[in-house]
Design a protein with these regions (language model features):
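Ribonuclease/tRNase effector modules and their secretory precursors
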Residues: 1-56, 60-224
Length: 224
């Protein structure tokens, strides 16, 4: 019995050392089961939106959309500094810029929201202010179809066939924006107003996150 207990003790010690070794080696970068990587995976499965100020910051640092994805993937999360109470959580991340300098920034995440806001200009969750500016889709999960809706009922020519979801997805990510001032971000299931230029007009639609897509509630042309 003593021999068995001794072996179990050594096994437990070795297992614990192995876990610590893996954790410090990967530092939230390679283990999908770590809390930090679960958060980052949830972020990258949604649409990261940036306003004009954050876009200007990225331009100044010469960081592309692909660079933002890499930045998030390689960042670590400080849960002790993050504000994670309530439906919408604000996480503090530590990353590295292309020039080698460190960057402390913020990301907000709501489980029932398809949109994630990023703030490269602040590092304290208490200082984070939701922008009322126009938000541009910057980083998103690569899939052909991000939208679901009753296309035949909207009455917009060119968006009635089976190709409507893919067509709208392409237009939104290449030319569209989210009108953040009209978004209801405090609800249990946030809804957003999306603007998409199309053939000299602007299509306005509202939608919410459902089964990893944007469920379209309304879709119409913008009135003058």
């Amino acid at each position: 019995m003593n021999t068995l207990l001794r072996r179990l003790k050594y096994y437990g010690i070795g297992f614990g050392i192995g876990l610590l070794f893996v954790f410090f080696i990967f530092k939230q970068k390679g283990c999908s089961w770590t809390p930090g990587n679960r958060v980052k995976e949830a972020v990258l499965n949604r649409i990261i939106v940036a306003d004009s100020l954050d876009l200007a910051f990225l331009k100044g640092q010469k960081i592309s959309a692909a660079g933002v994805r890499t930045l998030v993937q390689n960042s670590s999360i400080s849960f002790s500094e993050s504000a994670i109470k309530g439906d919408r959580k604000t996480y503090v991340l530590f990353g590295e810029l292309p020039n080698g300098k460190s960057l402390k920034y913020l990301i907000t995440l709501h489980d029932q929201d398809f949109m994630v806001e990023v703030d490269f200009l602040h590092s304290n969750p208490a200082a984070f202010q939701r922008t009322l500016r126009e938000g541009k889709p910057l980083v998103y999960k690569p899939q052909k179809n991000w939208f679901h809706g009753a296309w035949d009922t909207y009455g917009i020519a060119g968006f009635k066939g089976a190709d409507a979801p893919e067509k709208l997805t392409s237009l939104f990510f290449s030319k569209g924006s989210i009108e953040l001032a009209s978004s209801s971000r405090n609800e249990a299931k946030p809804t957003h107003r999306i603007m998409v230029p199309y053939e000299g007009k602007t299509i306005v639609l509202t939608g919410f996150y459902y089964q990893e897509k944007i469920e379209v509630q309304e879709m119409r042309y913008q009135t003058p």
